[in-house]
């Protein structure tokens, strides 16, 4: 669920970063339109696409299980429910994407606003 995603992001990035990504670019936050503005925003675009492929459960609400290793930074999705595991994998890939692209984060895209995202969206 979205709370767990925020926790996973904080685990992987080793600090509480949820507020920085809550409304960033054209895709970080609720929904998304237009073209991703940078690699950080593209992480959110890919995450939105991943959630869009989940069927049989609710990515924003359903609770999954995962473990995080502080030693090596690995996230491992667990549990027996394949749908919830798929949600966790979407979140895991996005959290790692944020970490790997943290240098592309540009504060000018924080609270960027949909009015600046009028280009045609690319397909997932």
Swiss-Prot record:
Q: Which SMART domains match?
A: PA2c (SM00085)
Q: Name one GO cellular component term.
A: extracellular region
- Which residues of this protein are catalytic? 47, 91
Residues binding Ca(2+) are: 27, 29, 31, 48
Give the subcellular location: Secreted
Q: Name the EC number(s).
A: 3.1.1.4
Domain of life of the organism encoding this protein: Eukaryota
- What the protein does? PLA2 catalyzes the calcium-dependent hydrolysis of the 2-acyl groups in 3-sn-phosphoglycerides.
- Similarity field: Belongs to the phospholipase A2 family. Group II subfamily. D49 sub-subfamily.
Can you name this protein? Acidic phospholipase A2 2
To which species is this protein native?
A: Bothrops asper
Q: What are the top taxonomic ranks of the organism? A: Eukaryota, Metazoa, Chordata, Craniata, Vertebrata
């Amino acid at each position: 669920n979205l709370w767990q995603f925020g926790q996973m992001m904080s685990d992987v990035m080793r600090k509480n970063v949820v507020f920085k990504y809550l409304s960033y670019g054209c895709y970080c936050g609720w929904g998304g339109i237009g073209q991703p503005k940078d690699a950080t925003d593209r992480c959110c675009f890919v995450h939105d696409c991943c959630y869009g492929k989940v069927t049989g459960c609710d990515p924003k609400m359903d609770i999954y299980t995962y473990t995080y290793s502080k030693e090596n930074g690995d996230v491992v999705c667990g549990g027996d429910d394949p749908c919830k595991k798929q949600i966790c994998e979407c979140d895991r890939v996005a959290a790692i994407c944020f970490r790997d692209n943290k240098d592309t984060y540009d504060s000018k895209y924080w609270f960027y606003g949909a009015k600046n995202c009028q280009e045609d969206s690319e397909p997932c």
